[in-house]
Amino acid sequence: MSNTHPFVGEKISYEKGLQFWDDFSEHYSNRQQGDIPCRIIDRLFETGMLTEDCNVLEIGSGPGTYSLELAPRVRSVRCLDSSPRMLMRLMSKASESGIGNIVPVEADWNSYEDGSEYGCCIATLCPGSGSRESVARMEKLSNGSCVLVSWTCNHGDDLNAQVWKALGKDYGYGFRGSTEVQDRLSSEGRDVKVELFQTDIEMDIPVEELVAKEVSSFKAYGNNMDVSDIVRSILEPDADDGIVHFRATNEMKLIYWAV
């Protein structure tokens, strides 16, 4: 798979990249992560990176995949995200679940300022969170631990790469297999721990649901091309009465260290 992210190939500006996630928020799903978020949080408690009296800063909280699991087990979670729609989804779910210790913050992490200290700063699938600058900000705000969660393999994105290929663009997500972040953190003297988590995903998805997701994605890129026919041409040969039987093993990476 190509290592060129569509953002890079299409020369999407930083500001448009932020807007992408707000525009795409309705179709953003945690289904491809399976039970990994729960297992990661359990592991962070086992290792002492998280404790019950911990105030947590989550960077890139999205609609609450990790926040909603974290909040009942810690003192508080401050959820930072640049997308107001993502935060609306998060707070709606928190209200439905009776969770009252989540504080939503609509802000861009790269310009965020906070005079507080947190027992743990955790970045969950937040683009660029492993950069030197981002890690330095995380460590400045944490008096306990720092955590990075990222994909190494998400087969849910294979369709997106196939659509780009049909358009003559060689884009993909092969860069997720890189060890650059943990290698750099270790070389700079941190006692970094790295663990991989796999999950088997099995689900039946209507073709039209996947069509709507990809159409939304391409609109968010600012591309007015209607890719619906391309998506259908990819999916329908293997679909069963309009249903795609999705089966895959996905993998995520957990990086953590004490500050």
Task: Please tell me what each predicted stretch does.
Residues M1-L50, D53-G62, V147-G172:
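Conserved class I S-adenosyl-L-methionine
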Residues P63-N110:
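Class I SAM-dependent methyltransferase SAM/SAH-binding core
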Residues E113-C120:
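A short acidic, Gly/Pro-enriched loop at the edge of an enzyme's catalytic core
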Residues G128-L141:
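A short, conserved alpha-helix within the catalytic core of class I
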Residues G174-G189:
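Short alpha-helix
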Residues K193-V259:
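Conserved Class I S-adenosyl-L-methionine
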